[in-house]
Structures are given as structure tokens and as C-alpha cells.
């Protein structure tokens, strides 16, 4: 993937304007250190900073169709590009890049080809035949994208806010799953899955369907011509990703080029829960494991850089982005260009600790829908920008469109957390990979309780951040915060500290409006705070705020899961038994 910048329909065609576009494009150079390009056609500029992963030798951008009448600059990975090429037999492709199909699909289908793309992407396509353009962003918003408008009537597009904030009168986050057409001068949502309406699904839970869909999501993301690895925290999600990758790597083209030995990476404070759990999983899977430690001071020293790169003042995002930012630098120094990661599972399966308080399956499901829709503002933002700060790409198989459709079509009663019945968070995901004949993971890892990333890297990390902020923000500053920051007023010294840094880098009103706000507990939406009256006055978004839920050890019923005595799920809800001959413990 890469960094893109486009200025469309501007009134200035001078050399000075070209120099300015190049200057702004260089603000995105960290996203694509391998190559840069700028194409001008009349009043339109398309700039690109490339991180070369597929066809690194010839896939430089912008990309064109045969007669160069269609021009595309894109940040993305199209996993089904080989299949799409076969559907375009009358087209000649100029490169082996996975994104080369976009211009040709547009020639065949006009603006109506977005659903055909299986992957993650943000792109600008210029049709020079009538000087029109379209802009599109992937379904969930794994890739970052912003849109802005200049006083001269120009439209600006950038992978990061820093590429356009100084030159636009107004700018905002480009909505995921949408297309912007210059013909209509409006957004149109192209991603319309059944779960988006938040209606309650009724399909029975099929553990094999969940397993196979997720394995497929992981395997398709092993498309590469460069070295890669897996982020491994030792929790359920990253461990499953690592297990599947390790299991299937030998059968992929990547193994022919880079070997079948998987490299795994973990970060944490010395002695943190994640380091210990990740080492155990790595030993079990036989990966080449790289363990990075940092101190609280290391993290504090990086905070300003993190806020500049991640472009947010959201507390939980900054807490979690900082260790990931530090780890990404180390990973890139080893020659690795991309990693596969476990973001998205908690949103899909209700894995956050506050889901224990969901009053019924309807509330549970609508909250998962809200969380998925907001991912581009939180975990996707973190995974994309904290890694790309060092030219490292993160791929997230849990956010595969097909997998989301399978998981979100399941009756949410199966996802409900019922501790008195031994059903912990994400039970149906755990059970789908509980294979006695060929285990994916050790039992105690498969049933390890959820840790927020910022907690798992070491509990003293958050405490250290709070202590540091308290040295820079006084009680008087907090009392007057509402007069200084009228939008998303910070309520804690830590939040105020981050906001001050953010405003220094991004002082525009449009910038502060790109960051979500509102009450939250353990990463909940504002609506879910209503589930427990005790949460209404909570100021700490950490998972530890969900008192009585986060346990240092499992109770007896949870221990039964680890000790080969899973809860008898089928007695709760009738369910079809698996029939494909794969051992699923029940």
C-alpha cells in the first residue's frame, strides 16, 4: 500500500502549484518510501508515494489503461486481482500490480465495480475523456482517507490529514464504503451488506463455517512479493491469525520466495502479560519470534510523534498506538514490509469486556454493528497509521468482507456472554477453532480472557501516561477546558494533554471534528454506557473500568473450557452438528 494525494479541478496550473503538490505529497513519504510519482492532466494533479509489495519492479503509479485515458492513483491491496484479470480478456495490463485492474474495471463497468474488489483500497480515478473523476474507499475503512475543498472550487484527496489540512477551507474523513463522483458532486454508499441495517439475524451458528471463512480470509492476505510477519500479542485474535498463517504458509507462493518459517513480533513493557503469552504461542507454533520491550519513558517520548502520525486525540487510540508505533520501527528495520494483525474481532463478536453487560441479544447485535461502523475512527486508524509511520503495512483478516458477512449473519444469542453458563467473550470464535485432532492453539491460550492492547503491553503503561499528563496539566486548566476546547471537551488531564499536542499540529476546526467523542467505558459506544448506571460517571476508557469483569483467573466454569470440558452449547439453542468430519469439541 501507499500514500496518495490528489488535487482535482484547481484554478492554478503554474509550476508553483506543482511544487506545492509535491511538497504536500512528501508529507506522506513515510507511507511509501520506495517510489514517488506525480501526474498532471490539466487542472488535476495525482501524486503517489509507493510502498512496493506486489510487483515491486514495475508497479509504480499512477496506473493507466491501454491508451492512458484513465489514470488511477491508489492505496490498496486487491486480493482477487488475478481472478479479475481473467474476467477482462480483452484488456492489456501494463504491470503486474494488483491495483492495475481498477482502470480496466472502470472501462468495462463505469462506476459500478466497487463490489467486485476483494481487498482494501482508497483510490482516485481520473477519466480524461470527459475530465470527470471518482474517489472510493474500502468497505470498513481499513485504509485511511480524507477529502477537502479549496476556496477555488478544487477537491482534495489525501491518505492522511496532514496532506491537505493547510490548503483546504474545509476537510473531513472520507466515509468508508462510499464513492464520491464528480458527476454528481455527492457521496454514494456502495457497501450495503444485510447487517448494515442492524436488523437482528437468525442464522444458526455453524463452527465450521466460521472456521473456514476465517482461514480463507487469512490465506488470501498472504499475497506478497516481499518479506512479511505476524503481530502476536498472545491473545486469542493474534494467536489465531498466527496459527492459521503458520499452518498454511508452506502452501503459498510467499514460501517459495521467503521460506516457510513465519516471523512473529510482540511488544510490551518488561514482564508484561503480552510478552509472556506471545512467547508461549510462538514456541507452540514454531515461529521465529522477535520480542521488543520498551519503557514507559520510551513511550512518553514518542507521544508527540504518535499524535502527529495517527492524527487523533482519542485517549484509547493514543494509548494503544504508541507501543505499535515503537514496534513498527523495529520491525521495518529487520527488512519486513508488511504484517498481518488481529484487529476487528472484538467488534464482530462482542469481545470487549463491557459486552458482559449487554441486556439482550438485540442490544448486543446493534452494538456490534455500531462498533464495526466506527472502526475506521479507532482500531483501523491505529493499525494503519502507527505502522505506516515507518513504511510498514498491516493487513487485517477479521475485516474481510466475506468473513464479516458470515459472522454478522449469526443469531446474536450465540454470541451473548453468559459467565454463569461458562460462555466467555467470543466463545463462538474460540469454539470454532477448538480442534482436538489438530489443535490450533493450547487450550489456555484459546480461552485466554480479553486484554486491551494498551493494557496487555503492561499495566504500568497507562498509569505512567496519567502521571506524565498530571505534570503538564493543572487543575485550573481542567476547570477551564470547556472554554478552550468547546468540541469534545477533555475531561481528564491525560485527554487534555493529548488535545494540546493535537491542536499544535492540526489547529483547524475541520481537524478537531474528524475525531470522535462522547462517553465510553472499555471502548464502548456512548449508547452502550447506558447498560450499567455505574458507568455513567466513568472517566477512564480502559478495559479495567468494567469492574468485576476483568478477572486475574477464570472461575470454575471457565476453567472447564480449558480442561477439556466445554459448556454444552446446544442445550441453550438448537444447532446443526458439523458434518464435514473435522473435530470440533462440543
UniProtKB/Swiss-Prot annotation:
The keyword Protein transport does not apply. L-glutamine binds at residues 50-54, 75-77, 98. Coiled coil: none annotated. One of its GO terms (cellular component) is cytosol. The record marks 343 as: Important for beta-aspartyl-AMP intermediate formation. This is Asparagine synthetase [glutamine-hydrolyzing] 1. Its EC number is 6.3.5.4. The gene is AS1. The keyword Amino-acid biosynthesis applies. GO terms for molecular function: asparagine synthase (glutamine-hydrolyzing) activity; ATP binding. GO terms for biological process: L-asparagine biosynthetic process. Residues 193-516 form the Asparagine synthetase domain. InterPro entries: Asn_synth_AEB (IPR006426), Asn_synthase (IPR001962), Asn_Synthetase (IPR050795), AsnB_N (IPR033738), GATase_2_dom (IPR017932), Ntn_hydrolases_N (IPR029055), Rossmann-like_a/b/a_fold (IPR014729). It comes from the Eukaryota. Pathway: Amino-acid biosynthesis; L-asparagine biosynthesis; L-asparagine from L-aspartate (L-Gln route): step 1/1. Residues 2-185 form the Glutamine amidotransferase type-2 domain. PANTHER family: ASPARAGINE SYNTHETASE, ASPARAGINE SYNTHETASE [GLUTAMINE-HYDROLYZING]. ATP binds at residues 231, 267, 341-342. Keywords: Amino-acid biosynthesis, Asparagine biosynthesis, ATP-binding, Glutamine amidotransferase, Ligase, Nucleotide-binding. It catalyses: L-aspartate + L-glutamine + ATP + H2O = L-asparagine + L-glutamate + AMP + diphosphate + H(+). It is an enzyme of class 6 (ligase). The active site is at 2 (for gatase activity).
Amino acid at each position: 500500500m501507499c500514500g496518495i494525494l490528489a488535487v482535482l479541478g484547481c484554478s492554478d496550473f503554474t509550476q508553483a502549484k506543482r511544487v506545492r503538490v509535491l511538497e504536500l505529497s512528501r508529507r506522506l513519504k513515510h507511507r511509501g518510501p520506495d517510489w514517488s510519482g506525480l501526474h498532471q492532466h490539466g487542472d488535476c494533479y495525482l501524486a503517489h508515494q509507493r510502498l512496493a509489495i506486489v510487483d515491486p519492479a514495475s508497479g509504480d503509479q499512477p496506473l493507466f489503461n491501454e491508451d492512458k485515458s484513465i489514470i488511477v492513483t491508489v492505496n490498496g491491496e486487491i486480493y482477487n486481482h488475478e481472478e479479475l484479470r481473467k474476467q477482462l480478456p480483452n484488456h492489456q495490463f501494463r504491470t503486474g500490480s494488483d491495483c492495475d485492474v481498477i482502470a480496466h474495471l472502470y472501462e468495462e463497468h463505469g462506476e459500478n465495480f466497487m463490489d467486485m474488489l476483494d481487498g482494501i483500497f482508497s483510490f482516485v480515478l481520473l477519466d480524461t475523456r470527459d475530465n470527470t473523476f471518482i474517489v472510493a474507499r474500502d468497505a470498513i475503512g481499513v485504509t485511511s482517507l480524507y477529502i477537502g475543498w479549496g476556496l477555488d472550487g478544487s477537491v482534495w484527496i489525501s491518505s492522511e490529514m496532514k496532506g491537505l489540512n493547510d490548503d483546504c477551507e474545509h476537510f473531513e474523513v472520507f466515509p468508508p464504503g462510499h464513492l464520491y463522483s464528480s458527476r454528481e458532486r455527492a457521496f454514494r454508499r456502495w457497501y450495503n451488506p444485510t447487517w448494515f441495517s442492524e436488523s437482528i439475524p437468525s442464522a444458526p451458528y455453524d463452527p465450521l463455517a466460521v472456521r473456514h471463512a476465517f482461514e480463507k480470509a487469512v490465506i488470501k492476505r498472504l499475497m506478497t512479493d516481499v518479506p512479511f510477519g505476524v503481530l502476536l500479542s498472545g491473545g486469542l485474535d493474534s494467536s489465531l491469525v498466527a496459527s492459521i498463517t503458520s499452518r498454511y504458509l508452506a502452501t503459498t507462493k510467499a514460501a517459495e520466495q521467503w521460506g516457510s518459517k513465519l516471523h512473529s513480533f510482540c511488544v510490551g513493557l518488561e514482564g508484561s502479560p503480552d510478552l509472556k503469552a506471545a512467547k508461549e504461542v510462538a514456541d507452540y507454533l514454531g515461529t521465529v519470534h522477535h520480542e521488543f520491550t520498551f519503557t514507559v519513558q520510551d513511550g512518553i517520548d514518542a507521544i508527540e510523534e504518535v499524535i502527529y502520525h495517527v492524527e487523533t486525540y482519542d485517549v484509547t487510540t493514543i494509548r494503544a498506538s504508541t507501543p505499535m508505533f515503537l514496534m513498527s520501527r523495529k520491525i521495518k528495520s529487520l527488512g519486513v514490509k508488511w504484517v498481518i494483525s488481529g484487529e476487528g474481532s472484538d467488534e464482530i463478536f462482542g469481545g470487549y469486556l463491557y459486552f458482559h453487560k449487554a441486556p439482550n441479544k438485540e442490544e448486543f447485535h446493534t452494538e456490534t454493528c455500531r462498533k464495526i461502523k466506527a472502526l475506521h475512527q479507532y482500531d483501523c486508524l491505529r493499525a494503519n497509521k502507527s505502522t505506516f509511520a515507518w513504511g510498514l503495512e498491516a493487513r487485517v483478516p477479521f475485516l474481510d468482507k466475506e468473513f464479516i458477512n458470515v459472522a454478522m449473519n449469526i443469531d446474536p444469542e450465540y454470541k451473548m456472554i453468559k459467565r454463569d453458563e461458562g460462555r466467555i467473550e467470543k466463545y463462538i470464535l474460540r469454539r470454532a477453532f477448538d480442534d482436538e485432532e489438530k489443535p490450533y492453539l493450547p487450550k489456555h491460550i484459546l480461552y485466554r480472557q480479553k486484554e486491551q492492547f494498551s493494557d496487555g503491553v503492561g499495566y504500568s503503561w497507562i498509569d505512567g501516561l496519567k502521571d506524565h499528563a498530571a505534570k503538564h496539566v493543572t487543575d485550573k486548566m481542567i476547570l477551564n477546558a470547556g472554554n478552550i476546547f468547546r468540541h469534545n471537551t477533555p475531561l481528564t488531564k491525560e485527554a487534555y494533554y493529548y488535545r494540546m499536542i493535537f491542536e499544535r499540529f492540526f489547529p483547524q476546526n475541520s481537524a478537531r471534528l474528524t475525531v470522535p467523542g462522547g462517553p465510553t467505558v472499555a471502548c464502548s459506544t456512548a449508547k452502550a454506557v447506558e447498560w450499567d448506571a455505574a458507568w455513567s460517571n466513568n472517566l477512564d476508557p480502559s478495559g479495567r473500568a468494567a469492574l468485576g469483569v476483568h478477572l486475574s483467573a477464570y472461575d470454575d466454569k471457565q476453567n472447564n473450557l480449558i480442561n477439556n470440558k466445554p459448556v454444552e452449547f446446544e442445550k441453550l439453542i438448537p444447532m446443526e452438528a458439523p458434518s464435514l468430519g473435522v473435530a470440533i469439541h462440543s
